[in-house]
Amino acid sequence: PDGTLNKHKARLCAHGRMQQWGVSYWETYSPVVNMLTVRLLLALCNIHGLESKSIDFVLAFPQADLDVDIWMELPLGIEVAESPEQSRAYVLKLRKSLYGLKQASLNWFEKLKQGLVDRGFTPSEIDPCLYLKDDMVLLKYVDDCIIISPSIENIDRLIKSMQRGRENFRLTDEGDVNKFLGIEITKLDNHSFELSQPFLIDRILSFLGLCNNNFETDANSSLTPVAKGLLHQDLAGKSRKYSWNYRTAVGMLSYLQNSTRPEISMATHQTARFSNSPMLSHEKSIMRIGRYLLDTRKRGIIYKPDVSKGLECYVDADFAGGWSQADSENADNVLSRTGYIIMYADCPILWVSRLQTEIALSTAEAEYITLSQSLRDVIPLITLLKEINTVFPVHVKMPTFVCKVHEDNQSCITMATTTKFSPRTKHIALKYHHFCCYVK
């Protein structure tokens, strides 16, 4: 995760831009594991004291077979022995999926999936990158995998089976899981662990010019990631003055907040709204987030599982919080903000802060929309827990297969728990009532 060079790689890449749909490729999409699943499995691994290992597949894409006929010119430096001067007149038929092909990631996904299914694994219905078997689970993100089981011998046996099987997977055993997708996983005392990304934060600070290559800085830090008030379009404001790419900064901050820093979610989302035409005020907001990260670069989320607590969801909404009289004609300013966090055994596994897509007409309606959106994540999560429970127990002292939702708006609670008809709420779309049959 610190960006240190481990090894040099030489890759032959295809020109995927020259491919034609229906001729040299069909489907291209391949899923990756949800971060919710990663955090949930790490919490369960800690609760039950399970063993875990990470593996990395070497040159993953070329290990997969192609599903269509693709021909390629000879790469520069390769000649035909019989007639070297005519080498450019020859072509090669590809047998494996090269980097650069549009379907390369999908071919690799199917290759690994078939190899795991042949070894008795079953893919999850909720997360297709989670595989379950007996007392073992495996989750994958392209070519990086985490294997969890009560027995380290079973994990080693699976790794050897994949290396020596008919697929002849080329992989490296990375040992204990101490990093995954650039996230540091640090085991602490008292059965707790921490998720952090200090090296990504260093990269962000260097990108924004807040520190040098030695991470020395004379910039002032900020106590909070966002200033008082909300960002607006600011078309009459001053133009940008910084040279760094605005969208790149937003992308790095978005990955950081989605992985280990939920407290910057709202601030990051505000800046992301104006990626198309940022002004100086929007740049200053990003710089404020950077200054906040200066003093908190080594901080992350500390997970201390509490087995007395099960699945819980905390919900809140900010009704038309962006409205201002100075910019009252902008419809986006009256959108309410959704915010919720889902906890399992007192460990945060999912958090969201975003604007609602419809204009709510009251606080109760804004809260109800937020409640509905949060339960779109909760309901499949319950199914995911049931799937994992077939491999190893996920029960804590309170029932795990129900979710306690914390909502403080009484009108919203009434709408969610009763079928009482009200002329003031009949306009609420059917899609927000989807969870009512689950309420108890």
Question: Can you say where each PLM-predicted feature lies in the sequence?
Answer:
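Short amphipathic alpha-helical segments embedded in low-complexity Lys/Glu-rich regions
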Residues: 58-59, 128-133, 176-181, 271-273
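Polymerase palm active-site segment centered on the conserved acidic dipeptide of motif C
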Residues: 119-126, 146-201, 205-208, 213, ...
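A short alpha-helix capping/helix-loop junction motif
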Residues: 87-93, 177-180, 265-268
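Divalent metal-binding acidic/histidine catalytic loops
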Residues: 12, 29, 38, 137, ...
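Metal/cofactor- and membrane transport-associated sequence elements
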Residues: 1-139, 144-164
